[in-house]
Regions:
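Acidic, PIN/NYN-like endoribonuclease modules and their adjacent C-terminal/linker elements
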Residues: 67, 98-126
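Acidic catalytic patch
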Residues: 64-87
Length: 126
């Protein structure tokens, strides 16, 4: 099973929270194939810049890139994401991330309420 670790889950992982410990089991499992969208990378980088500094943002970027396959938003994902955004009351970022997971046949690991109840989602939130 390929897992797309969503920004919500990465934020918990980097915070070292209880839920982050669950995310860590996926990250540390060398047999686990992990992907991220370029949107996830941008969101976590921005979050680190907002809360910390560029050095921390770079450290987190390197950690993500060293462990995950980075899937850029291409034309197919952009169109699919736009359709998801049109059908649901989501932000475009979440729609692009979900479109990436669908295209790559991946399960989304997240606690973001937008993803709750969807197929191919491991939901970590309440």
């Amino acid at each position: 099973m390929t897992v797309l670790i969503d920004s919500w889950a990465w934020a918990e992982f980097f915070a070292g929270s209880k839920i982050g410990e669950i995310v860590k089991t996926y990250v540390m499992d060398e047999d686990q194939e992990i992907i991220i969208s370029s949107i996830n990378l941008a969101e976590i980088y921005r979050l680190a810049l907002d809360r910390f500094d560029e050095k921390t943002a770079e450290k987190r970027r390197r950690a993500m890139i060293s462990r995950c396959y980075l899937i850029p938003v291409d034309e197919e994902i952009a169109i699919s994401g736009a359709k998801f955004r049109h059908e649901r009351d989501w932000g475009l970022g979440d729609a692009l991330i979900y479109a990436t997971a669908i295209r790559e046949d991946a399960t989304v690991l997240t606690g973001d309420p937008h993803f709750k109840g969807l197929n191919d989602v491991i939901f970590l939130g309440d």
